[in-house]
Structure formats: C-alpha cells, structure tokens
C-alpha cells in the first residue's frame, strides 16, 4: 500500500490536472442525465397494473391521464377552453361534457346523474379528463401539463399523478442546488471548528465534490435516475465518505510526528494506512447499498447503484485527489492551523468502561420499546398528499374532492371491448354499489337506457373502445394508499373479473396498492441481505465469529431507536424510510464501529488488560467518531430543514438524527458490550489473545 502512496505523491500534479479535466465530461454527463419524477414507474413491469398501462398506451395511444377542474366558468367558455386543451401537443384526447353529448343536445333531456359527473351546479365547477399520448413521467407529458396551464391562463386545476410529477420536478429543480450548498457550508463550519485547520475543510470539500461530480456525471450511462436519487446522492456521498478524508488527514499528521519530517514520505505512509483501514469499512458501506439492488421495486436499484458507485469514487478521490491537494497547498495549510478544541477523552473513556453496567441496563431497557416503535411507526405511500398546499396539483386535488362528491382519485378498468351492454351495465351497477365509490361508468352505462349509444360521436366511442379493450372509469372517495381504497380495489377487481377474466384495474390508486405489497416484501429482503453481507465482511475483516454479531446488534439497536422515535412522536414517515435509513445508517455506523474495534484488537494483542484495551480504543476513537458523526449530521440536517419535498426532508432528518444516535451507541453501548463479552471475543477471534501474560 505504501508503494501506491509513493506513486500518488510522485504524480500529484498530473493527478490534479487529470482530476480537473475529468470534471468537463462529468458536468456534461450530469446535465444530460434524465431525471424520473414518477415513483410508480419503478414498479415491476410484469404486474397487472403496469401491463395495463402498456395496453392503454399501445391500444389507445393514451399513457398518462389527468382530471381537470374549471371553477366558475359558463358552458360556452368551458367548450372553448376544451378546444384549446385539445390543441396542445401530446394531448391525445379530452373527455368532457360537450365532447360526450355535443353542443346541440339540450342538457335538460340528460339524466341528472350523468350531468353530475361533469358539472356541479351549486359551485359552478366543471370537470373534464385529459389523456396524454405518453407516460406519466415523460418529458412530453410534463411539457403538455405546463402548456395546458399556460393556454388556459391558469384557469384550470389539474389533478392526478402527471400534475404531481410536473410540480415535483419544478420544485426539486429549484431546491436541489441549495441542498448541496447548505450541506457543504454546514460541514465546513463543523470541520473548521472541530479540526485543527481552517483551510483543510475546503480541500475536503473540493476532493469530495469532485468525486460527487464524477458520480453524478457517470449516471449518464444509466440512462436516467430518480429525482430522489439525484437529490440525495450528493448529500449522502458527502456524509458517508467524509470519514475517509478525516482518516487520511489524521494519518498524515501522525506520520509527520512519528516517522519523519519529510512531508512526501509522511503522505505516502498516510495513503497506505488509509487504504488499509478504509477498504474494509468502505466495502461494508458498498455492501449495504448493493443490498438495495435486490428490491423488485427498482428505485432500490437506482439508489443502490448510484450510492455504491459514489462510495468507490469517494475512496479513490480520498487517496489520490485529496493527498495531491494537501501536498500542493501544504504551506497554506500550515499557516491556517489552530489549536484543536476537542479535549483528551482518556478519562471519559475510562469512566464509561468502569460504568459499563449502566449503559448495558439502558441498552436492555430501550431495546424493547425501540423494536416496538420501529415495527409500528406509520408510513405514507401517497406522495402527493405531502406536497405544499400552494402547488397547483395540491389545490386541484382539494377542488376535485370538494366539488365532485368527495372524489379523491379516479382509476380505470380495462375490459373486453366485446363485453355486452348488459354485462357492462351490470358490472358498473355492482361497482357503484360499493362503499366509497363516487361513480363508475362505461360507455354503455353512462347514458343508461334514456339515450341510445348511437347518439354518441364516433370519435368518443373510439377513444374509449378499442379492438380488444374498452376503458371504464371509477371515481373513489377514499384516500390513495388507505386500507379502505386497497380493499375497494380488491372488490372492484373481483367484480370486473367476474364479467371478464382478463380485465385489469389500473391507475394511480391500484399502482400504489401494488407498491405497498411489493415494498413490504422488498424491505424484509434488503434488510436480511444487508445484515448478512455486512456480517460476513466484518467476519473477514476482523477475523472473528462473535464480533460481527456484536457490531451488527449494536448498530441495529441504533437503527431501531432512530426509526422507532416517529411512533412515539406521532410522526408519519415516507414508506421507503426504513430500508433507505437502515441501509445508510448501517453502512455509515459500521465505519465508527470498525475503527474502535480495530484499535481494541491491537491493544488486546499488545498485552493490555480487558478494560485498559477498551479504554484506550475508546479514548483514541471518540474524537474521530464525534467529528465524523457531526459531519454527517451537518450534511443532512440542513437539507431536512429546507426541503419542501417531504420525502427528501424526512429522509434527511432521519439520517441526521441517526448519525447522532449511532455516535452515542458506538461511544457508550458498544464498549460496554466489549466489557461484557471480552472473554467470548478473544476466544472466537484471531489476533486478540495477549502476546504475553496480562490481567484479564
């Protein structure tokens, strides 16, 4: 490893030149990487709801759809508005009152129930549906949503997933640069205070920043990334890989003091030591992210690949770019050195070790409530419900519910186009009889027997009936992702299949129901895979059977406490929190744990007694653990405070709190477990037994 360090030191200038040149293609790649704002897009392609979406697109030329509420406009002006909307690029069709019956049919002869589908006479609100010719999250659909708003002078409110995706994109694009800025500023403040140089945080940020740009730029080769991945990747990479930079700096200072005054030689030694120490902890972090790739909900694959790649690039940057920067600006660094405010922790470490029984009791007392809270914390799946109320899509959902019989969402049934009018009417009657249904209608049932179907325009019939399938609309009063709507969808699906075995229930609500079912299974798989992977990595790194169990148990305890707190505070968190936070907190905390355990092993092997070895390991590790944890906290806490997208804000808040909880667990609980289980550890591990007789 030292040979590699010498090569880096020798080639430091070419390394810096190359690293800056690589920023050019990386920046180009970053700006040309498409971002996907639709969470439901990541559902498996082989489930009914996703196959139904494909049929809708292939057979009807319709992908996304939206419900539009127009407030306080007369019928004539609504008709003009509809014609404007029909002229927007990528609008496949519009289904409206005038489109169904034409302008020549007197409204008085229409059934009151039919009119109520489109008009609320009391409030003056009018409803019509827009179908787009591309998928929910496509660039064309999002442009069409915005253009519809523009051509109607924002006189309409567009509800549905397409509108949510469009507004989320607008908001995320404005805020994401501020996430990075806030994270960098706060981390620099923490490092400037707790480290011994005012300038070194700048070089940390420059080195890590380059690795982040390389990572985000290389996402171009993935085709596209989720907006969640894009928003979190930079902040997470900063928080997770900061440890490596801190370790290199400390190793460099130690090498200068202990081995030589030759800064080049000291850096070569520091690079070698950093690689040796960081490889094990970085592999565990990468393993945690790779575990996300085992999800059938492929957002896990998206986030897992990007973050694993980011950790690898972070390690490479830490042992190439950062040493080159430090040596190049060594004199400037010397001039900005200041006294460390971090005290000596030898006495606190001895006190913790001598009073380990206190922390073991706390550990046991908190474990049960933490696990219970973790298993019972409420989560939400309907992302639109957490967006700011000022957004057009949020106002539209409210208008839809207030003006049209409490309607919260509209989904569809794809049924056989040759289904008889009798069966179609019977199916719709059964669906309309279910609790929580505002209306269910097909072409055959819409006008009942009072107006013959032949009176409908051929263009409308062709919009709703294809060669193989026909579209039936179902409006629900229930909230998306609620138990009530999921039960309702099951009943609607059963009714539809009674009349047509090949029918499918599709739309946002059915997709969200599938999301709940699939991710529940996925999260259990990821949790098991990540724990097993990290268990075996710790086993090989520390050459121990017992230590993987002890370390994983301590870290999982920290995760249970973090994820259990929302239950006791009555906070509802995003559905993906448990797997993302669990993976990240596990991967980040294991760095602290391995750092202290490695020193404990070295001191035990050197002949120190149990308590002396643990005290030395703890006392020397506490400063690094505190700085690293506070750095991660700073990187995520600020983003959690400013993010308007609740999913991003919640995830960052959980990560920030998790960093602090993990810090306390590693400082207080882990050494206490070492004290309790020292005999087990030294008899089930290689390299722990004292080389000479000493008191245990």
Regions found by a protein language model. Give the residues of each.
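Surface-exposed, low-hydrophobicity interaction/linker segments
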Residues: 35-38, 102-104
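Membrane-embedded transmembrane helical bundles of large multi-pass transporters/channels
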Residues: 1-35, 41, 136-381, 497-696
């Amino acid at each position: 490893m030292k040979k590699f360090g010498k090569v880096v030191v020798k080639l430091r200038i070419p390394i810096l030149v190359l690293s800056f040149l690589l920023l050019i293609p990386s920046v180009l790649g970053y700006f040309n990487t498409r971002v996907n704002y639709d969470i439901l897009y990541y559902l498996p392609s082989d489930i009914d709801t996703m196959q139904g979406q494909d049929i809708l697109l292939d057979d009807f030329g319709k992908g996304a759809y939206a419900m539009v509420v127009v407030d306080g406009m007369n019928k004539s002006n609504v008709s003009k508005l509809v014609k404007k909307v029909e002229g927007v690029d990528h609008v496949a069709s519009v289904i409206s009152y005038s489109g169904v019956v034409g302008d020549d049919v007197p409204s008085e002869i229409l059934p009151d129930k039919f009119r109520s589908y489109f008009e609320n006479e009391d409030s003056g609100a009018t409803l019509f549906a827009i179908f787009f010719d591309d998928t929910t999250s496509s660039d064309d659909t999002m442009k069409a949503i915005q253009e519809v708003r523009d051509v109607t002078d924002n006189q309409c409110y567009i509800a549905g997933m397409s509108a949510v995706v469009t507004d989320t994109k607008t908001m995320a694009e404005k805020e994401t640069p501020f996430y990075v800025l806030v994270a960098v500023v706060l981390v620099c403040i923490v490092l400037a205070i707790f480290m011994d140089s005012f300038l070194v945080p700048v070089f940390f940020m420059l080195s890590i920043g380059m690795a982040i740009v390389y990572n985000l730029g290389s996402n171009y080769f993935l085709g596209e990334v989720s907006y969640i991945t894009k928003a979190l990747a930079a902040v997470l990479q900063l928080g997770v890989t900061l440890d490596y930079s801190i370790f290199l700096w400390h190793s460099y200072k130690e090498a200068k003091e202990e081995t030589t005054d030759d800064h080049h030689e000291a850096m070569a030694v520091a690079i070698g030591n950093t690689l040796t120490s960081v490889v094990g902890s970085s592999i565990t972090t990468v393993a945690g992210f790779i575990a996300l790739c085992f999800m059938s909900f492929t957002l896990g694959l998206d986030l897992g690949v990007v973050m694993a790649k980011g950790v690898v690039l972070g390690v490479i940057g830490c042992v190439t770019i950062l040493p080159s920067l430090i040596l190049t600006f060594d004199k400037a660094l010397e001039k900005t050195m200041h006294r460390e405010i971090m005290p000596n922790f030898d006495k606190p470490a001895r006190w913790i070790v001598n009073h380990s029984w206190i922390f073991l009791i706390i550990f046991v007392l908190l474990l049960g409530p933490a696990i219970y809270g973790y298993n019972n914390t409420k989560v939400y799946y309907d992302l639109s419900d957490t967006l700011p109320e000022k957004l057009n899509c949020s106002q539209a959902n409210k208008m839809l519910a207030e003006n049209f019989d409490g309607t919260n969402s509209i989904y569809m049934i794809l049924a056989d186009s040759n289904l008889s009018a009798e069966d179609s009417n019977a199916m719709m009657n059964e669906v309309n009889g279910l609790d929580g249904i505002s209306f269910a209608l097909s072409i055959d049932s819409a006008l009942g027997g009072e107006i013959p179907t032949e009176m409908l325009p051929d263009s409308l019939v062709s919009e709703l009936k294809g060669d193989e399938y026909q579209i039936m609309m179902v409006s629900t009063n229930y909230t998306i992702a609620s138990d009530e709507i999921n039960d309702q969808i099951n009943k609607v699906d059963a009714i539809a299949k009674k009349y047509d075995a090949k029918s499918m229930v599709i739309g946002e609500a059915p997709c969200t129901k599938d999301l709940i079912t699939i991710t529940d299974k996925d999260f259990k798989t990821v949790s098991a895979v990540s724990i097993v992977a990290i268990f075996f990595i710790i086993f090989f790194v520390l050459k121990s059977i017992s230590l993987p169990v002890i370390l994983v148990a301590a870290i999982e305890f920290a995760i249970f406490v973090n994820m259990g707190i929302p239950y006791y505070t009555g906070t509802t968190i995003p559905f993906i929190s448990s797997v993302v936070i669990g993976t990240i907190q596990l991967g980040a905390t294991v760095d602290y744990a391995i750092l202290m355990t490695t020193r404990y092993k070295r001191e035990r092997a050197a002949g120190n007694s149990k308590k002396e070895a643990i005290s030395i390991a703890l006392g020397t590790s506490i400063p690094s653990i505190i700085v690293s944890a506070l750095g991660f906290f700073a990187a995520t806490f600020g983003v959690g405070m400013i993010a308007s997208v609740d999913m991003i804000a919640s995830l960052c808040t959980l990560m920030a709190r998790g960093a602090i909880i993990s810090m306390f667990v590693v400082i207080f609980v882990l050494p206490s477990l070492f004290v309790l289980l020292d005999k087990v550890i030294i008899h089930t591990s290689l390299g722990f037994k004292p080389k000479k007789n000493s008191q245990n």
